[in-house]
């Protein structure tokens, strides 16, 4: 149901992703995240192509956190910001964070391997149905993603949407 992976460059950290549909309490979840009651990034799954996209954003966020160069105030807000192709923080939250009307949520948790993570506590806060993280592609709004990341038809023919999105995320700070 959920996906837990170690970060290759930061062996002491583990990333856990959870996906929910038919969520009825997005407003409360968003408020809990803002207040620090949920220590995780709450992401709109319609803007996610694959769990790997989240892993890339998380890896970059942990790296920036460790070297003290984050552009946002927390590790979890940095994950959301890293998903965006632009450097506008508020736009990143509007497009990639959850809104009060959302009925699905992709939760990303980052934890030290030595810490115990109570996944059941997070799951109990969500009034919705947990589904396998691999199903995130079924929720993807492909047209919206292509428009936001400016994916050309030529690029679409020669590579995958995931490759194009991850490339845009990677070069954001360079371009």
UniProtKB/Swiss-Prot annotation:
GO terms for cellular component: cytoplasm; cytosol; EKC/KEOPS complex; nucleus. Disruption phenotype: Embryos display primary microcephaly, leading to early lethality. Marked apoptosis is observed in the brain (telencephalon). Fishes do not show a renal phenotype, possibly as a result of early lethality. It holds the Pfam family CGI-121. It comes from Danio rerio. GO terms for biological process: tRNA threonylcarbamoyladenosine modification. Component of the EKC/KEOPS complex that is required for the formation of a threonylcarbamoyl group on adenosine at position 37 (t(6)A37) in tRNAs that read codons beginning with adenine. The complex is probably involved in the transfer of the threonylcarbamoyl moiety of threonylcarbamoyl-AMP (TC-AMP) to the N6 group of A37. Tprkb acts as an allosteric effector that regulates the t(6)A activity of the complex. Disulfide bonds: none annotated. Belongs to the CGI121/TPRKB family. This is EKC/KEOPS complex subunit TPRKB. It is found in: Cytoplasm, Cytosol; Nucleus.
